[in-house]
Amino acid sequence: MTLFTVATLAEFRAYLGVETGADAPLLHALRAATAHIEHQTHRRLAPWLGERYADLLLHDQRECLLREELLALHACWDAFDQPIPLEELVLLYGSVLHRLDGVFPLRGGPIGAVRVLGIWGCHDDWAQAWRSTDDALSAPIDAATPTLSVADADGLDAALIAPRFSAGQLIRIEEEFCVVLSVDAAANTLHVQRGAHGTSAAAHAASTPIERYLPPAHHVQSCLRLAAFFYRQPLEEAAALPTDAPTPRPRL
């Protein structure tokens, strides 16, 4: 289970104009909003690494139809489990793989005839989807380390936006994805979910740069507005009740 949220806790606090208070109800609303958007759109809003099978197009066996949106192609195998050189494949419209050196061979049927390994997700500008945090690991970590030490947890990132780290954020250390669960700005430490979104937790040396994922701006705004509705709804209902009435539970 991922704890990624499309909008971060810091962005949500700024949106609500709330600087203090408990993190838990805010994160609960952000996670509910993220899950709701994914459920309604049938899309994953964060990148993830994995294998998926693609279906061969019988009217043109140079092409196969992907079942999800592909952001980056890592490897591909045909129906006979033979690797296909990546330079012979072109991604069209995010959902079709076109083969340049011939056709995809058919074996047993077109459904699931091609196996694809890559980064999947929903983003309209994958080339610009990651930005430097202007920070790095202050100490080496192994695959089991849940806490990362950094130079300045609430400093400016490469775009001069602060804080550079916030709960709900997806970060990348070399090839590993991590989700930030909480930030201790005083100690300059991050508590994270390691090996997130299909990647594997690995050892990383001190001074390894850390990047942050940038969801499309319209995804962030949709998440903020929906999370605000989820967050405020029980508060508004409670205000309308008699003082001795129990506080209603959120309807998500």
Summary of predicted features, one role per range:
Residues 1-252:
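Divalent metal-cofactor coordination and adjacent catalytic microenvironments
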